[in-house]
From Swiss-Prot:
<dbReference type="InterPro" id="IPR022805">
    <property type="entry name" value="PEP_COase_bac/pln-type"/>
</dbReference>
<dbReference type="InterPro" id="IPR021135">
    <property type="entry name" value="PEP_COase"/>
</dbReference>
<feature type="active site">
    <location>
        <position position="545"/>
    </location>
</feature>
<dbReference type="GO" id="GO:0005829">
    <property type="term" value="C:cytosol"/>
</dbReference>
<dbReference type="InterPro" id="IPR018129">
    <property type="entry name" value="PEP_COase_Lys_AS"/>
</dbReference>
<comment type="function">
    <text>Forms oxaloacetate, a four-carbon dicarboxylic acid source for the tricarboxylic acid cycle.</text>
</comment>
<dbReference type="Pfam" id="PF00311">
    <property type="entry name" value="PEPcase"/>
</dbReference>
<dbReference type="GO" id="GO:0006107">
    <property type="term" value="P:oxaloacetate metabolic process"/>
</dbReference>
<keyword id="KW-0460">Magnesium</keyword>
<protein>
    <recommendedName>
        <fullName>Phosphoenolpyruvate carboxylase</fullName>
        <ecNumber>4.1.1.31</ecNumber>
    </recommendedName>
</protein>
<dbReference type="GO" id="GO:0008964">
    <property type="term" value="F:phosphoenolpyruvate carboxylase activity"/>
</dbReference>
<dbReference type="InterPro" id="IPR033129">
    <property type="entry name" value="PEPCASE_His_AS"/>
</dbReference>
<dbReference type="InterPro" id="IPR015813">
    <property type="entry name" value="Pyrv/PenolPyrv_kinase-like_dom"/>
</dbReference>
<keyword id="KW-0120">Carbon dioxide fixation</keyword>
<dbReference type="GO" id="GO:0006099">
    <property type="term" value="P:tricarboxylic acid cycle"/>
</dbReference>
<feature type="active site">
    <location>
        <position position="138"/>
    </location>
</feature>
<dbReference type="GO" id="GO:0000287">
    <property type="term" value="F:magnesium ion binding"/>
</dbReference>
């Protein structure tokens, strides 16, 4: 890398050297020399040295079984350490301005208050921002929690090293700690022995809050308050919470038979337990701080003139939190203890009201400096996390709800709900929703699958609304899908209005989304239920798998526009829930750009966005990184609300319509219509092997016997990222853009790229994917793993990749990809020589594994090394799915 990244390069080199010393200590000089030799050959190969490439391949294929695992581990861990160094560089004192952009909130406030936005309007919008980041488990999340914690400790050491006042002894101690941590990592098994359970995944999500977000949220709000006060002279409210957090971990049962009502109950208890435990730590610290005696009349009266009135209140809260933890421990262990709710923190006001009373007393008595310390941080944590820590969404497939009613209507002799048309379904559902008598007979014994759906609904009825988020209906397509869930909730005793959210996922469902919501809002009963609020989820993963990224992106954009128009006409506030993944092929990419590229009027101060597995770690895994991410989200939503992008010109729309039509045709022409595609996909990628890895709790397929259509979007992306072709993230796009150029529309495309955030974001995402794609490596996989009669398909795919790259370079008037984002380009270049050997080794291991028989199974060394190469490539690509 260039000199502008000197501090980053220094950290990468230092950590790499320590890793090398660790390997030398435990495996000897000869092993380390072989690793270094292969690394240097990989670099030479990257420069076009064919002899170096051949020599590297000879060394890799000749590795004895006992060296497979340590070799894969060596390159895997180097890539993880490089990732750490990059993460740290973005929050480092030595961060270069090309990497670390100025604070986005500070920049935005300057632009807004420079005559573009009324100050009062800006403050009102900021105070009411409603950004909900929904943490979701990731079926291909690679890193184990124990390693993530060690990586965080390494970052702490890197931060300590930046202190110029350290003595030589202190620097030696930090270096020793780094050596200890890297040795611990080297001797820790990187691959889980067993799949994580849904509860394990939920605990992983809670650990992110405890280790990072719990600290980051008040830090971010303090920073935001200072910025606003400096610009406007006004303070933000003490209970401001522009960003909150929800979760799908333990609530998402779509296609996951392991997420049961019992599991969801345990996760709800664990969420509340984690919150009580963290608030207890805070209250214990606050008892030590608030030792003063002076108080206002309200606090004096409340504490009977105690000489330590603040501690009097805090000690009571401390005991209530301890009792709450004991109660929740008993529940988690399977007991159902009888309790006096008044002795516990049972609702948010039990904690909020006493703390606000203390805050007001300190304020009234002139101790504002003290009030705005730890006490304010606790109040803001409470506003953000509540006493339930995360609001748990429930997600289930629309068909499962219909099956409940189908079984019930058959039992009642009414026919089969699944065989009724939409008009008949709606008439029945609305009649029963308005009927006070129960529909479900007390003596009915449903099947196990139906009972599970009903048990989940009963669980929802038992819990307070603040513990839960939305009930998301996957594969929704009709108004009856929503009404069915509402009826099931009614019949199971749910009295609080839960948000029931249709998720439109396929291309056809996205195109029909506005019509579906129009029909719903035309129903008087439903309008009354919504109380003027409607949430709709837009699916990115499955729509891209269904139609390709370009057609899916345009369908998502149009669906949002139409939904905004429908809800505006009905006088209903719309919240759009974006089901984005981490990868480009699943709607991922920089969140700031993504939000600013949404249709004008579609954000309006409110947004929900999924944050998945590996992206949670990259964005929120360190407190300072989390502060940056919270600032990016806040500034983007504020800007999209108050300074929305212009409406796209009609000629741009017409062009996108043509591009979408041509791209979906090109995409489906391969994925659906090419008879050899499935066979090629399964041979040229580790898709089959991925299904055997103990990575996530959810099965990789919806149906065991299905083809591409049954494969979940995440492993679909993951498999193609392993062989470096990255196909789902670009297939169809290049062909459509080339067709536009051939129509003489290159100038129009360049105007769109320059002036339309939606289109420019799509092009920049394509650039990033094209830069990561490695057709020569994909060809090597093909040569080693795919039958020669299928090679023609690989050649076609690589030609299409090359076509896409050329047309994007022409469109952007660039000689190289990512010319305008040198940091990203350098990052890709840094990793390639370390990922390449893992790819070549993975190919060899796949070939060995696929030759195994019951008489000659692949050795344990081969199987574990294969898993490590998959983990290493994922770390290097920073892209699982």
């Amino acid at each position: 890398m260039t000199d502008m990244y000197a501090s980053l390069r220094s950290n990468v080199s230092m950590l790499g050297q320590i890793l090398g010393d660790t390997m030398r200590t435990h495996l000897g000089d000869s092993f380390l020399e072989k690793v270094e030799q292969i690394r240097k050959l990989a670099k030479d190969s990257r420069r076009g040295d064919e002899a170096a490439r051949e020599q590297m391949l000879e060394l890799l294929t000749a590795l004895p079984d006992e060296e497979l695992v340590p070799f894969a581990k060596a390159f895997n861990q180097f890539l993880n350490l490089a990732n750490l160094s990059e993460q740290f560089h973005t929050i480092s004192r030595n961060c270069d301005e090309l990497v670390c952009v100025p604070d986005p909130v500070e920049q935005l406030l300057g632009r807004m208050l420079n005559g573009r936005v009324d100050q009062t309007k800006m403050l009102d919008c900021l105070k009411t921002l409603d950004i909900d980041l929904v943490l979701t488990a990731h079926p291909t999340e690679i890193s184990r929690r124990t390693l993530i914690q060690k990586y965080a400790a390494i970052v702490d050491c890197l931060a300590e090293q930046e202190n110029n006042q350290l003595s030589d002894r202190e620097r030696q101690q930090i270096n020793l700690r780094l050596r200890q941590l890297i040795a611990q990592i080297w001797h820790t098994n990187e691959i889980r022995r067993e799949r994580p359970t849904p509860v394990d995944e939920a605990r992983w999500g809670l650990s992110t809050i405890e280790e990072s977000l719990w600290h980051a949220v008040p830090d971010f709000l303090r920073q935001l308050n200072d910025q606003v006060q400096e610009r406007t002279g006004q303070q933000l409210p003490i209970d401001i919470a522009p960003v909150r957090f929800s979760s799908w971990m333990g609530g998402d049962r779509d296609g996951n038979p392991f997420v049961t009502a019992k599991v969801t109950q345990e996760v709800l208890d664990r969420n509340r337990h984690a919150a009580a435990r963290l608030f207890l730590k805070d209250i214990v610290l606050l008892v030590g701080e608030l030792s003063m005696e002076e108080a206002n009349d309200e606090l004096k009266a409340y504490t009977n003139n105690s000489c330590e009135p603040y501690r009097f209140v805090l000690r009571s809260l401390r005991q209530k939190l301890r009792d709450t933890i004991d109660y929740l421990n008993a529940r988690i262990e399977g007991h159902n203890p009888e309790v006096d709710k008044s002795t516990l923190i049972w609702q948010e006001s039990d904690l909020k009201a006493p703390l606000e009373m203390l805050y007001k007393s300190l304020y009234d008595c002139g101790m504002r400096l003290i009030a705005n310390g730890l006490l304010l941080d606790i109040l803001r944590r409470l506003a953000c996390f509540g006493i339930h820590m995360l609001r748990l969404d429930i997600r289930q497939d629309a068909g499962r709800h219909c099956d409940v009613l189908a079984e019930l209507t058959r039992y009642l002799g009414m026919g089969d709900f699944n065989h009724w048309d939409e008009t008949e379904k709606q008439a029945f559902l609305l009649r029963e929703l308005s009927n006070r008598r129960p529909l479900i007979p007390s003596n009915w014994q449903p099947s196990a699958d139906v009972a599970e759906v009903l048990n989940t609904c009963r669980l929802i009825a038992k819990h307070p609304a603040k513990a839960l988020g939305s009930y998301v209906i996957s594969m929704a397509s009709k108004p009856s899908d929503v009404l069915t869930v509402l009826l099931l909730l009614k019949e199971t005793g749910c009295t609080h209005p839960m948000r029931v959210v249709p998720l439109f996922e396929t291309l056809s469902d996205l195109n029909n989304a506005a019509a579906c919501i129009t029909d719903l809002l035309d129903i008087d009963w439903y309008r009354g239920y919504t109380k003027g609020m409607q949430e709709v989820m837009i699916g990115y993963s499955d729509s891209a798998k269904d139609a390709g990224v370009m057609a899916a992106a345009w369908a998502q954009y149009r669906a949002q526009e139409q939904l905004v128009a429908v809800c505006n006409q009905a006088g209903v506030k719309l919240t759009l829930f974006h089901g984005r993944g981490g990868s480009i092929g699943r709607g991922g990419g920089p969140a700031h750009k993504a939000i600013l590229s949404q249709p004008p009027g579609s954000v309006d101060g409110r947004i929900r966005v999924t944050e998945q597995g590996e992206m949670i770690r990259f964005k929120f895994g360190l407190p300072k990184l989390a502060v940056q991410s919270l600032a990016l989200y806040t500034s983007a939503v504020l800007e999209a609300t108050l300074l929305p992008p212009p409406e796209p010109k009609q000629e741009w729309r017409n062009c996108m319509e043509r591009i979408a039509e041509e791209s979906v045709s090109a995409y489906r022409g391969i994925v659906r219509e090419e008879p050899d595609f499935v066979a090629y996909f399964r041979a040229a990628t580790p898709e089959v092997e991925l299904g055997k890895l103990p990575l996530g709790s959810r099965p990789a397929k919806r149906r065991v016997d299905g083809g591409i259509e049954s494969l979940r979007a995440i492993p679909w992306i993951f498999a193609w990222s392993q062989n470096r072709l990255m196909l789902p993230a670009w297939l169809g796009a290049g062909e459509a853009l080339q067709a536009a150029c051939q129509r003489g529309e290159i100038g129009l495309l360049q105007d769109m790229e320059r002036e339309w955030p939606f289109f420019s974001t799509r092009i920049s995402m394509l650039e990033m994917v094209y830069a990561k794609a490695e057709p020569n490596l994909a060809r090597y996989y093909e040569t080693c793993l795919v039958s020669t009669n299928l090679h023609h398909l690989g050649e076609t795919l690589r030609q299409r990749l090359d076509l896409g790259i050329k047309v994007v370079l022409e469109l952007t008037k660039s000689d190289t990809l990512m010319a305008h984002t040198p940091w990203n380009r350098e990052s890709v270049k840094l990793r390639n020589p370390y990922i390449d050997p893992l790819n070549f080794l993975q190919t060899e291991l796949l070939a060995r594994t696929r030759k195994e028989t019951s008489e000659t199974p692949a050795s344990e060394h081969v199987q574990l090394a294969l898993m490590l190469t998959i983990a290493g490539v994922a770390a290097g690509m920073r892209n699982t799915g």
